[in-house]
Amino acid sequence: MSASVAAPPPALSRKAEFKAAKAELLARFQTATNVTPLMHALSRATDDALRRLWHECGLPATLALVAVGGFGRGELSPHSDVDILVLLPDAHARELDERIERFIGMAWDLGLEIGSSVRTVDQCIEEASQDVTVQTSLLEARRIVGSTALFERFMLRYREALDARAFFQAKVLEMRQRHAKFQDTPYSLEPNVKESPGGLRDLQTILWIARAAGFGSSWRELDTRGLITDREARELRRNEGFLKTLRARLHVIAGRRQDILVFDLQTQAAESFGYRPTPAKRASEQLMRRYYWAAKAVTQLATILIQNIEAQLFPATSGVTRVLSPGRFVEKQGMLEIAADDVFERHPDAILEAFLLYEATRGVKGLSARTLRALYNSRDVMNNAWRRDPRNRHTFMQILQQPEGITHAFRLMNQTSVLGRYLLNFRRIVGQMQHDLYHVYTVDQHILMVLRNIRRFAVAEHAHEYPFCSQLIVNFERPWVLYVAALFHDIAKGRGGDHSALGMTDARRFCREHGIEGGDAALVVWLVQHHLTMSQVAQKQDTSDPEVIKRFADLVGNERRLTALYLLTVADIRGTSPKVWNTWKGKLLEDLYRATLAVLGGAQPDAHSELKTRQEEALALLRLETVPPDAHRALWDQLDVGYFLRHDAADIAWQTRVLYRHVAADTAIVRARPSPVGDALQVLVYVKDRSDLFAGICAYFDRNGLSVLDARVNTTRHGYALDNFIVTQTERDVQYRDIANLVEQQLAARLAESAPLPEPSKGRLSRLSRTFPITPRVDLRADERGQYYILSVSANDRPGLLYSIARVLAEHRVGVHAARINTLGERVEDVFMLDGTGLSDNRLQIQVETELLRAIAV
């Protein structure tokens, strides 16, 4: 008897068939260099599947199934939504509703991510008039199956109702609002390939506006119309192709709709494009640089196109308002306009002049589309001869030396690629991401952010932000020297080697070529060479040690250098990430500045005189607090010189006022107050010392979501620990005054317990840290005097890290004398001063280092 195999149910067969067809296309998406034909093929396969379902559901010929949005355009990324409109005649039988619901349900069953609407023609027109998003999706409507007459009637009504001018204004406003959500920059760490500035949505917006205005629906048609040039059309197609391919590969790699280029996928996406890591750059950094360049080009060309379309839709009624540079530039409706299309070809020196005029001319708010286009198409003019032209070098220095508008001018020069063509080494770092868990901007954006920060110090309306910096820069002669240093301080990033040394060479050449001589040139070069030094000294060294201050003062040499380095350092740290700067770092830097300035002014770094000064200032404060005249002696007699040097007079007075009655306390005394230096909590702990005390305090802070910024640990002569911590709450918007009492009670109770130290919790790393982990490092060495050991730790930041370190030290009975906790974005670079007892044993040193590496490993 012959066996027969039953045919699969139609639904299963249909689903398997579509799934197989889609899988074959997805496999090709992974390697295709041009995905547009595949997007069309996926759209056609989806059309076919929907037609079959339409007929199976018995939907009448009087209805129409319409593709809208990207599906209407005939382009589907691997996991894009499939947007459809079921177009109804004005009158229809109610039983059709059930069939339509069945059709949509079967489409979902097929595996399609359906976005559906069911409307009559009148309803479509009404919805479109109320919502520009609906109006946009219908702009590219395409009939799949059903009534041609109904569809054509709908399109006729739609076109009649479409107001091209109103549509233009609505879409431009929508684009600006969308850009604002992404901080108006394409240079996000995790850009949205579709929605971010310079992404696919910007290109689609231009084509929607052009289509609505009747100017065409492709780059070729816009070229024919004269809205763009052949070269611009090629650039647009090339960058659009790259962005489409990148988006499609993200979908395939993620196995779902994924438009954000998240850290987790950047390496895989880079490898799919053939990028491989080099000693200087990760594969992901190479891909991101290509993405940023594409987004930058799209932004440039979109600006030109939108202005051109606007000029066609809203013809200007007035002509030239004033001549700014005879035969070269005029102002037209607040925009800088070239006098003739070939100005830059005939006068290459006019290229930089354009930015000088933009910067220096009141009422000029930007460059016109005509000027932007001429700049874009003058790239061949910006050659070696142009860079060497003394006129251009003079103009560039004029741009740097203007009293205002410098930041805007340099940003515009970068956006138009002129800055990178004038400074070729700057061009090398445009779009270069730094996956160092510290910087959140590309190198070029970071440099311009530092320039902006220095300029901001000099602007009166921003003086309240950093009053000390503003006070210093007002009296700083020729501040443009700082701007040059800002331009070059990181210009050598990504080349391999020491970027400070390489950048110093670039800066020296720039100064020589631009007539910067003598002390100004020497200062620029010195600042680039040492731009990291002040931060490292302030955050990693014991600045209470007079020798540390003396060495730094010897390096700096004079007040002008000190002030310049301080201003550059503050601007640099603030320009890395919104998370890195805090008031505590500001205090460390300002304290170092003031201490160094005193030495440069002739003050001798003498510990005895400094101790005497601090004590006198503290006593004056205690008298104001009505503390009895000799009450401080009981406590002060138990404190060494190091205590008085590590604390300022205000802290000494506060701690003395709290403790002078409790010098021999039987129980722990814990006091907390909002930190005088900024948004943090200052915590004082006074208790009989023990080897696990520091670890126990860190355990409490860890369990309660408090991050330690600074720890100053002191042991009195009679065996008490007098420890001072600066901590912050990881949750935002906390009122430290409200939690001070709670910390005092809970921490005192915790210290009264005799329980063993708990196991450290290995908190979760951020996605950035998981994707780009740094190699943990531990360095343990004796200090120069042999009195203490210095422990340096660098690792990915995570909850519980400090306690993990403290616990290892406690287990080996290694005392912590001081700690500088330096959090740089997603990484930490902590420095501990340890008691030297026992650490002279090399075997113990190796054991401690090994266990620390194990404790901080991710």
From Swiss-Prot:
HD domain residues: 443-565
Domain ACT intervals: 682-761, 790-858
UniProt entry keywords in alphabetical sequence: Hydrolase, Magnesium, Multifunctional enzyme, Nucleotidyltransferase, Repeat, Transferase
EC numbers for this chain: 2.7.7.59, 3.1.4.-
Transit peptide keyword on record: no
PROSITE patterns referenced in this protein's UniProt entry, alphabetically: ACT (PS51671), HD (PS51831)
Keyword Nucleotidyltransferase: yes
UniProt cross-references to SMART domains, sorted A to Z: HDc (SM00471)
Region feature (Uridylyl-removing): 325-681
Reaction(s) this enzyme catalyzes, per UniProt: [protein-PII]-L-tyrosine + UTP = [protein-PII]-uridylyl-L-tyrosine + diphosphate; [protein-PII]-uridylyl-L-tyrosine + H2O = [protein-PII]-L-tyrosine + UMP + H(+)
GO biological process, one term: regulation of nitrogen utilization
Reported regulation of activity: Uridylyltransferase (UTase) activity is inhibited by glutamine, while glutamine activates uridylyl-removing (UR) activity.
GO molecular function, one term: [protein-PII] uridylyltransferase activity
Cofactor(s) listed in the protein's UniProt record: Mg(2+)
Superkingdom of origin organism: Bacteria
PANTHER family for the chain: BIFUNCTIONAL URIDYLYLTRANSFERASE/URIDYLYL-REMOVING ENZYME, BIFUNCTIONAL URIDYLYLTRANSFERASE_URIDYLYL-REMOVING ENZYME
Annotated domain remarks: Has four distinct domains: an N-terminal nucleotidyltransferase (NT) domain responsible for UTase activity, a central HD domain that encodes UR activity, and two C-terminal ACT domains that seem to have a role in glutamine sensing.
Protein family membership: Belongs to the GlnD family.
Protein name, entry field: Bifunctional uridylyltransferase/uridylyl-removing enzyme
Organism expressing this protein natively: Burkholderia thailandensis (strain ATCC 700388 / DSM 13276 / CCUG 48851 / CIP 106301 / E264)
